[in-house]
Structures are given as structure tokens and as C-alpha cells.
Amino acid sequence: MSKWVYPILSIPEDKLAKAVIKNIDASVRDLYNVCKAIRGMNLKEAREFLNNVLEEKEALPFWRYSHGTSHRSNISRKWKVKSGRYPKKAIKYVLKLLDNAENNANSKGLDIDNLKIVHIAAHKGLVLKRYMTRAFGRSTRKYKYLSHIEVILGEV
């Protein structure tokens, strides 16, 4: 089994807080767009934005995997994208991850008001292969795709 490795950043290790959640039942396509939207934001800004998307006050822009996604009128012009969605399941996992990273930063003694998302990424996880029995002795495969997400918060 491979070892989990974070990217090498130019920020000192004592100014960083890390968190990872593995094998979550959320689409890696939705997680990719959520991560891209909040990358580089302050922690408070990211939470506020994600809560607005959960309440459907603002749509999450979809850069990739957006085929067939309709245009939304409540996307901010700063994104320069017209299509968006409300991926609630993915956002709940990302909010949980941000809470974990904030608690890690608090235990390290970092200033929570000055935390910025330095790195956030979503990766493909395991594929659980299952079979569903059908009539006349046949069976159909069912796949369940899992994902991983990681975040690094830095003190600015």
C-alpha cells in the first residue's frame, strides 16, 4: 500500500495545519469543483461561501465536468463561468474537513482568524465492486466510487 504524501510547500511546517479524509462517498467530480472554488480563500470566506451554496443562495461554478450543466443567474461575475450546481453532499464533506483542519491549527497554536487555504485537492479513491442478481441466472455489476480530499491551511 502506498504512503500518503502532502505536497512540498515553501511555508514553514510550524505555520501549517493539515487534514485529510479518505474513502468518502462523494463524487470526485463535484469535489474537484468545490476545491477549485475555495482554493486560496480565507477560512471564514470559504465557510461563508459554502454555506451560501448549501442554502442555494449562490451557485457553485463548474469549470470541469460541466457538460449538460445549466446556466445559473446567481453565479458571481468573479468566477467568469456561467454554469453551476449545488453539490450538497460534497460540500458537507469539505466543511467537515475544514473543521478538522481548523481544530488541528488550534491545537498547534495558530491564529484561526488569519488562516488561508494554501492547498486543497480531491483524488479518486477505491472502487467497490458489487453484483446484483438478475432473472434467468444473470447478474449485473454495480460500482461504488469513493474519493479522498486533503487540505493544508497556512497562517498568513
Curated annotation (Swiss-Prot):
Entry keyword Ribosomal protein: yes
A GO CC term attached to the entry: cytosolic large ribosomal subunit
Reported function: This protein binds specifically to 23S rRNA. It makes multiple contacts with different domains of the 23S rRNA in the assembled 50S subunit and ribosome.
Family under the similarity heading: Belongs to the universal ribosomal protein uL22 family.
Subunit: Part of the 50S ribosomal subunit.
Gene source species: Sulfolobus acidocaldarius (strain ATCC 33909 / DSM 639 / JCM 8929 / NBRC 15157 / NCIMB 11770)
Keywords carried by this UniProt record: Ribonucleoprotein, Ribosomal protein, RNA-binding, rRNA-binding
Name by which UniProt lists this protein: Large ribosomal subunit protein uL22
PANTHER family tied to this protein: 60S RIBOSOMAL PROTEIN L17
InterPro entries for this protein: Ribosomal_uL22, Ribosomal_uL22_CS, Ribosomal_uL22_euk/arc, Ribosomal_uL22_sf
Alphabetized SUPFAM superfamilies for the sequence: Ribosomal protein L22
